[in-house]
Amino acid sequence: MRQSWIEKRKNDSVRTQLHYARAGIITEEMQAVANVEGLSEELIRSEVARGRLVIPANIHHLSLSPMGIGVAARTKINANIGSSSLASCIEEEIEKTLVSIKYGADTIMDLSTGGDLDAIRCAVIEHSSVPIGTVPIYQILHDVQGDIKNLTIDSMLEVMERQARQGVSYFTIHCGFLLEHLPKVAKRKMGIVSRGGSLMASYMMHYHKQNPFYEAFDEILAICREYDVTLSLGDSLRPGCLADASDEAQLAELKVLGELTLRAWEKDVQVMIEGPGHVPMNQIERNVKLQKELCHEAPFYVLGPLVTDIAAGYDHIASAIGAAIAAWKGVAMLCYVTPKEHLGLPNAKDVREGILAYKIAAHAADIARGRIGARDRDDAMSDARYAFDWNRQFELALDPDRAKEYHDESLPQEVFKEAKFCSMCGPKFCSYKISQEIVSKHASGESLT
């Protein structure tokens, strides 16, 4: 779809969506986002130009269907997939990609750390119609045999350009965690829980030098500008437990991310900001407000947040609660959490469970925000339920397969798709049926009092 769009711009000196938006040009990608969101093309252009909406769309990902992340758009969700050094299979990552798209992921991050990382990534991009993001430090470390002491700025930039050429649409880079922040980490209950953040800490402590992503930020911007890779500024110091939420370390990094946002915008590079983490419910709104203030309203992209630390095996639920509140208060994209969080590498089944939990959270937030049309599907479901239209109910459900499966466990015969009851109440105790009888009597003139 995008090949002709990209081809006609090939002689432009800058080809980022932010550059075009600032020049007053509405690109085909902006038109596509406006159509999907039900918003005007000019609104999309102006939001991109202000930096409040990003369209992650690497010029080399030609099969990508453009989507927008920002407060003006519906709340988006990201699904994390990826191999590890203990479990690596390209076919499994392709399956996770397809499952993610089937159940509604708006973007996918390939967080692979084991196996043939380039082959996995290229396969994921090839099979994906949604933007693919990465955390480049994982491959950077992989390519230097897992020893952070072998990392050089040249090796960093080589990996990032390679991934950009392959079609990665956004990079998470841990560039706001500085050498001077290290003493603040010592005060924490759980230290650093970000993989990328812990690697940067190891590098800085070994060499007593500044964060290389911060040092090479201008060179990174040049790569992003060339391929229109959106920067997702990572939160190395996100809280990994409730006790560390909103602490001095987290906020010190957030201030630096705000400064780097302005530097990226100067180069026409799109930016979103990553956020926590583990946050008590009563602190979520404050975190969102601080991010908007310190990071100039760049889209906020949060992991959860988890609102309790004791839900192991059910962290997709614990985090979806926080995610719904965060999105209601202005977060633009939610990074899903699966039931395996803190316990192991998720499989395709876990991916499905995580996505559905977050689809619910995102949709509930859009309703609470009063987004036009957000409740239409809910109202249609109410009509289908009251009319006992079972097949329509299955179609409208966020997970049609699960809805039909649960209904058919007790009443599998096709005749029950026309029944005026389900297995919960049976024909005699159905409240809908009784209510309809009451309304019918009232309509025929019978007194209800």
From Swiss-Prot:
<comment type="pathway">
    <text>Cofactor biosynthesis; thiamine diphosphate biosynthesis.</text>
</comment>
<feature type="binding site">
    <location>
        <position position="174"/>
    </location>
    <ligand>
        <name>substrate</name>
    </ligand>
</feature>
<comment type="function">
    <text>Catalyzes the synthesis of the hydroxymethylpyrimidine phosphate (HMP-P) moiety of thiamine from aminoimidazole ribotide (AIR) in a radical S-adenosyl-L-methionine (SAM)-dependent reaction.</text>
</comment>
<dbReference type="GO" id="GO:0009228">
    <property type="term" value="P:thiamine biosynthetic process"/>
</dbReference>
<dbReference type="InterPro" id="IPR002817">
    <property type="entry name" value="ThiC/BzaA/B"/>
</dbReference>
<dbReference type="GO" id="GO:0009229">
    <property type="term" value="P:thiamine diphosphate biosynthetic process"/>
</dbReference>
<feature type="binding site">
    <location>
        <position position="425"/>
    </location>
    <ligand>
        <name>[4Fe-4S] cluster</name>
    </ligand>
</feature>
<keyword id="KW-0784">Thiamine biosynthesis</keyword>
<dbReference type="InterPro" id="IPR038521">
    <property type="entry name" value="ThiC/Bza_core_dom"/>
</dbReference>
<keyword id="KW-0408">Iron</keyword>
<protein>
    <recommendedName>
        <fullName>Phosphomethylpyrimidine synthase</fullName>
        <ecNumber>4.1.99.17</ecNumber>
    </recommendedName>
</protein>
<keyword id="KW-0479">Metal-binding</keyword>
<feature type="binding site">
    <location>
        <position position="301"/>
    </location>
    <ligand>
        <name>substrate</name>
    </ligand>
</feature>
<keyword id="KW-0004">4Fe-4S</keyword>
<feature type="binding site">
    <location>
        <position position="342"/>
    </location>
    <ligand>
        <name>Zn(2+)</name>
    </ligand>
</feature>
<feature type="binding site">
    <location>
        <position position="278"/>
    </location>
    <ligand>
        <name>Zn(2+)</name>
    </ligand>
</feature>
<keyword id="KW-0949">S-adenosyl-L-methionine</keyword>
<feature type="binding site">
    <location>
        <position position="80"/>
    </location>
    <ligand>
        <name>substrate</name>
    </ligand>
</feature>
<feature type="binding site">
    <location>
        <position position="138"/>
    </location>
    <ligand>
        <name>substrate</name>
    </ligand>
</feature>
<feature type="binding site">
    <location>
        <position position="274"/>
    </location>
    <ligand>
        <name>substrate</name>
    </ligand>
</feature>
<feature type="binding site">
    <location>
        <position position="430"/>
    </location>
    <ligand>
        <name>[4Fe-4S] cluster</name>
    </ligand>
</feature>
<dbReference type="InterPro" id="IPR037509">
    <property type="entry name" value="ThiC"/>
</dbReference>
<feature type="binding site">
    <location>
        <position position="422"/>
    </location>
    <ligand>
        <name>[4Fe-4S] cluster</name>
    </ligand>
</feature>
<keyword id="KW-0456">Lyase</keyword>
<dbReference type="Pfam" id="PF01964">
    <property type="entry name" value="ThiC_Rad_SAM"/>
</dbReference>
<keyword id="KW-0411">Iron-sulfur</keyword>
<feature type="binding site">
    <location>
        <begin position="235"/>
        <end position="238"/>
    </location>
    <ligand>
        <name>substrate</name>
    </ligand>
</feature>
<feature type="binding site">
    <location>
        <position position="109"/>
    </location>
    <ligand>
        <name>substrate</name>
    </ligand>
</feature>
<dbReference type="GO" id="GO:0005829">
    <property type="term" value="C:cytosol"/>
</dbReference>
<comment type="subunit">
    <text>Homodimer.</text>
</comment>
<feature type="binding site">
    <location>
        <begin position="194"/>
        <end position="196"/>
    </location>
    <ligand>
        <name>substrate</name>
    </ligand>
</feature>
<dbReference type="GO" id="GO:0051539">
    <property type="term" value="F:4 iron, 4 sulfur cluster binding"/>
</dbReference>
<dbReference type="GO" id="GO:0016830">
    <property type="term" value="F:carbon-carbon lyase activity"/>
</dbReference>
<comment type="similarity">
    <text>Belongs to the ThiC family.</text>
</comment>
<dbReference type="GO" id="GO:0008270">
    <property type="term" value="F:zinc ion binding"/>
</dbReference>
<keyword id="KW-0862">Zinc</keyword>
